[in-house]
């Protein structure tokens, strides 16, 4: 079964926890995915790289230093070595012992929580090995049906889609294009992940008409406040776009804040679904 990323199919916007619910739990961990679900998210975005033994692990940085008690490149460590690291204590002592998950483990949790998952390719060194490893992880059609592979590198997305039947891909863009549909079609993309800074309602309508879904990122609440002070006026414009059905998925680091904002904007509540972290 393939799970839709389109508002027209789901009937309500997907709330997406960026790296999980990363303002309340350590990013890119199973705890962060559970925390996103608990606050009403039906989607999460995670980042992935390769280990030394060519296993795909969920990690944003190429180095382990920032989010674990380990040092050096993830690609220099075996999966067993990576699994021995503490990926939670840096965030809060309550998460001591949290481990870096594999992509397969993250997808399994998405099945259990009935979520979809946007998987960013962060691998830079050995994309051939990454593609091969990904094909193994996504060998089951049910797993592919919950996944959208995303990247800034649209060429990589086109390549990986050609190798894995039925795989959906989303290109991340930080610029405004004169013809975003052409940009998406050039790399056979199913989704564009568009910065709010460059969001254009007419482009969104054209993308939807072409069958391409749209994800936008709402940043952290403090960044949102700073944007308002700078005159970007997202508080007024984003609710209009949400009510008009122009955005299929809205992601953010604080899922409860995101849920409250979307609920207030659209009149559709997103109540918590489970135990909150903290």
Where would I find each of the regions flagged by the language model?
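Phosphate-group recognition and catalysis centered on beta-loop-alpha active-site segments
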Residues: 1-278
């Amino acid at each position: 079964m393939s799970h839709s990323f389109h508002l027209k199919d789901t009937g309500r916007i997907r709330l997406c926890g960026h790296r999980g619910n990363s303002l309340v739990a350590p990013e890119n961990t199973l705890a962060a995915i559970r925390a996103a679900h608990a606050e009403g998210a039906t989607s999460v975005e995670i980042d992935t790289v390769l280990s030394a033994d060519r296993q795909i692990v969920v990690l944003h940085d190429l180095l382990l230093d920032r989010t674990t008690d380990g040092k050096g490149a993830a690609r220099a460590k075996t999966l067993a070595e990576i699994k021995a690291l503490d990926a939670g204590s840096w965030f809060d002592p309550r998460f001591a012992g949290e481990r870096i998950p594999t992509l397969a483990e993250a997808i399994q949790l998405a099945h259990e929580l009935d979520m979809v998952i946007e998987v960013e390719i962060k691998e830079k060194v050995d994309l051939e090995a990454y593609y091969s490893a990904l094909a193994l992880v996504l060998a089951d059609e049910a797993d592919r049906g919950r996944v959208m592979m995303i990247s800034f590198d649209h060429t990589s997305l086109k390549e990986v889609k050609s190798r894995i039947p039925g795989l959906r891909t989303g290109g991340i863009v930080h610029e405004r294009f004169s013809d975003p549909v052409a940009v998406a079609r050039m790399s056979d993309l199913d989704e564009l992940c568009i910065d709010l800074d460059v969001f254009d309602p007419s482009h969104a309508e054209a993308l939807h008409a072409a069958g391409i879904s749209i994800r936008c990122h709402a940043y952290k609440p403090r960044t949102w406040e700073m944007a308002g002070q700078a005159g970007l006026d997202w508080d007024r414009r984003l609710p209009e776009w949400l009510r008009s059905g122009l955005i299929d998925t809205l992601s953010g680091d604080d899922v409860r804040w995101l849920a409250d904002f979307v609920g207030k904007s659209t009149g559709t509540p997103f109540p918590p679904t489970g135990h909150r972290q903290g």
